[in-house]
């Protein structure tokens, strides 16, 4: 399950991290003055003269190599277009594990704050107090890997070409920009229109790449390619074996190596990413020492299968990391574009039939915790809390959007006796399906059109198939016929992109600063946009209104209320059958690899690790 979540992180980097920090002002008294950082809400943690992020080791040796494995395949080095959105090699840009090795952004996000950006390609930033415009001054030292300077023209070109040929969300962002203008030799200003919001300047700064105008062919940009790209990042592509391996080499002339936001990162001379068909072969390669680290997501394996000699000899080290962000949402996703899942009562009924207690005990050694909220384990979660006055005000125009038990904070997923045969949730599911017009004849559930109730769960790994089989067994007790179809990675990505499935296991990374990415997950406008993350096909005015409210919030209290209100609407919509999460992050490593002592709020950070051998 861990790698399934990592995949979605690598495709679309989402906001991370949590809690409040010391009171260092993000700006001078004049908020429009150029500065070194931007914060979404409140203050930033680090002063203007900070030397490095506190979760890095600025004295880490720069040497050696890191070899890691991932499950899947790739056929492109272009992460910015729809055609190769989900088949691009890992590590190039916006990768949840490896960061931005080749392409960079104007500013870099700290992984130890809710949503704060620090100088990178832009050495200074100025912003209007109302966030109607933002202006960046480029670092004069910024260079592409071929030695050419990074210029304002590159920034202008990036927005032009991504609007014309880029994938979501890049292609739609210019719709919020009234104008982009060159205001100096190294400065560029974005002025926003009425479609913008308070978060949008942060996205311009921290989640839009800057591309080299001189090195990109506009006519072919929309195609997949295996040509090594020119970037401004710390690594260049050294070699490529399509679908099997990509090797990155640290650029010895990297322009930003002495920036405070870069010190302690990018310590390996070479990083190799090896592709495997499944986790079993990947784990065997790790045991043999072919791979340096193994990111573990299987509690049974973590508990029972690390008994090989290298572990006993202390050559392989098992690390446990705690993070401060909400747990990721993993669940069975109903594709509500399919008529069989259009009725919320049907989705609610099927949600009652997942037996977490049995699965956790029998499949996962009791290691998992049940996920209930889309912001599980954080102050943004609505679970266990009655809606406050501000939430009720936001939800008032949408009567019926939130179930009463969700509104008053008493809702929770069903808790079974763990036997695998608990009749209480089954009876509730039976009643809901009956209310929705289903009948039960000869051991089969018959839908309102007179057809047997049947659907497919699409999976892509043995781990996914295992939990789908457990769910299938429970559904069959009510006469629901479920077929589990495991497909290869290429077919999975294609069907995912075109929403060609009944049900999948979906994963969403969560943060304490949700924002515009919520439109791509839940917004009505994204329902039929290929490449969006609206896997459930949500199109609900109440959802849209809550997203607008969280983006318009000017203080933390209003923001929290808006997110909780969105959480309540999503839970009440029964779009996901929430599954489970691990309370920790597990990584096994050979002793030649080391990491900093401090773990930031978002968890371990591979770009800050290093090689220890002589």
From Swiss-Prot:
Gene Ontology process terms (BP): microcin transport; peptide transport
Keyword set, alphabetical order: Periplasm, Signal, Transport
Signal peptide start and end residues: 1-28
Gene3D superfamilies noted in UniProt: Dipeptide-binding Protein, Domain 3, Periplasmic binding protein-like II
Principal subcellular localization: periplasm
GO terms under cellular component: ATP-binding cassette (ABC) transporter complex; outer membrane-bounded periplasmic space
TM stretches of this protein: none
Listed SUPFAM superfamilies: Periplasmic binding protein-like II
UniProt xrefs under Pfam families: SBP_bac_5
Domain of life of the source: Bacteria
Compartmental location: Periplasm
GO molecular function: peptide transmembrane transporter activity
Similarity comment text for this entry: Belongs to the bacterial solute-binding protein 5 family.
Protein name per its UniProtKB record: Putative binding protein BMEII0691
């Amino acid at each position: 399950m861990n790698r399934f979540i990592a995949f979605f992180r690598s495709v679309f980097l989402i906001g991370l991290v949590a809690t409040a920090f010391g009171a260092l002002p993000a700006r001078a008294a004049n908020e429009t003055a150029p500065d070194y950082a931007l914060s979404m809400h409140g203050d930033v943690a680090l002063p203007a003269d900070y030397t490095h992020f506190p979760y890095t080791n600025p004295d880490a040796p720069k040497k050696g190599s890191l070899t890691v494995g991932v499950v899947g395949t790739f056929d492109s080095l272009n992460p910015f277009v729809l055609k190769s959105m989900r088949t691009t090699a890992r590590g190039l840009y916006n990768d949840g594990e490896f960061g931005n090795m080749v392409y960079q952004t104007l500013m870099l996000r700290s992984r130890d704050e809710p949503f704060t950006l620090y100088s990178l390609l832009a050495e200074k930033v100025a912003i209007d107090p109302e966030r109607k415009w933002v202006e960046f001054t480029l670092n004069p030292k910024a260079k592409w890997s071929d030695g050419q300077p990074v210029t304002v023209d590159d920034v202008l070109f990036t927005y032009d070409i991504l609007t014309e040929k880029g994938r979501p969300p890049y292609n739609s962002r210019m719709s919020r920009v009234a104008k982009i203008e060159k205001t100096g030799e190294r400065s560029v200003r974005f002025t926003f229109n009425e479609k913008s919001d308070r978060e949008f300047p942060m996205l311009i700064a921290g989640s839009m790449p800057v591309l080299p105008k001189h090195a990109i062919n506009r006519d072919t940009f929309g195609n997949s390619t295996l040509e090594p790209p020119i970037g401004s990042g710390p690594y260049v592509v050294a070699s490529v074996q399509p679908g099997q391996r990509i090797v990155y080499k640290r650029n010895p002339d990297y322009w930003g190596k002495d920036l405070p936001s870069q010190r302690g990162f990018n310590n390996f001379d070479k990083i190799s990413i090896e592709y495997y068909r499944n986790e079993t072969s990947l784990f065997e390669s790790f045991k043999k020492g072919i791979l340096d680290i193994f990111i573990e997501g299987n509690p049974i394996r973590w508990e029972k299968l690390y008994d090989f000699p290298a572990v006993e000899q202390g050559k392989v080290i098992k690390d446990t990391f705690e993070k401060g962000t909400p747990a990721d949402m993993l669940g069975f996703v109903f594709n509500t574009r399919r008529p069989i899942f259009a009725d919320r009562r049907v989705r609610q009924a099927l949600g009652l039939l997942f037996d977490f207690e049995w699965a956790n005990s029998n499949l996962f050694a009791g290691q998992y915790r049940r996920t209930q909220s889309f912001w599980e384990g954080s102050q943004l979660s609505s679970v266990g809390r009655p809606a406050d006055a501000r939430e009720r005000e936001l939800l008032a125009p949408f009567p019926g959007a939130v179930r009463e038990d969700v509104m008053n904070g008493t809702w929770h997923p069903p808790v079974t006796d763990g036997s695998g045969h608990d009749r209480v949730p089954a009876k509730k599911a039976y009643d809901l399906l009956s209310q929705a017009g289903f009948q039960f004849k000869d051991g089969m559930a018959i839908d309102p059109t007179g057809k047997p109730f049947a659907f497919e769960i699409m999976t892509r790994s043995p781990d996914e198939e295992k939990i789908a089989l457990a769910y299938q067994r429970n559904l069959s007790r009510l006469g629901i016929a479920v077929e589990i179809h495991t497909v290869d990675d290429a077919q999975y990505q294609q069907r995912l992109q075109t929403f060609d499935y009944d049900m999948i296991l979906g994963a969403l990374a969560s943060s304490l600063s949700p924002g515009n990415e919520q439109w791509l997950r839940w917004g009505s406008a994204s329902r039929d946009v290929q490449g969006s993350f609206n896997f459930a096909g949500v199109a609900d005015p109440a959802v849209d209104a809550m997203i607008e409210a969280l983006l318009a919030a000017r203080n933390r209290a209003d923001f929290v209320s808006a997110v909780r209100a969105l959480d309540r609407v999503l839970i009440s919509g029964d779009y996901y059958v929430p599954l489970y999460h691990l309370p920790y992050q597990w990584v096994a490593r050979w002793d030649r690899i080391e990491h900093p002592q401090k773990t930031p709020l978002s968890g371990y950070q591979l770009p800050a690790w290093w090689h220890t051998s002589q």
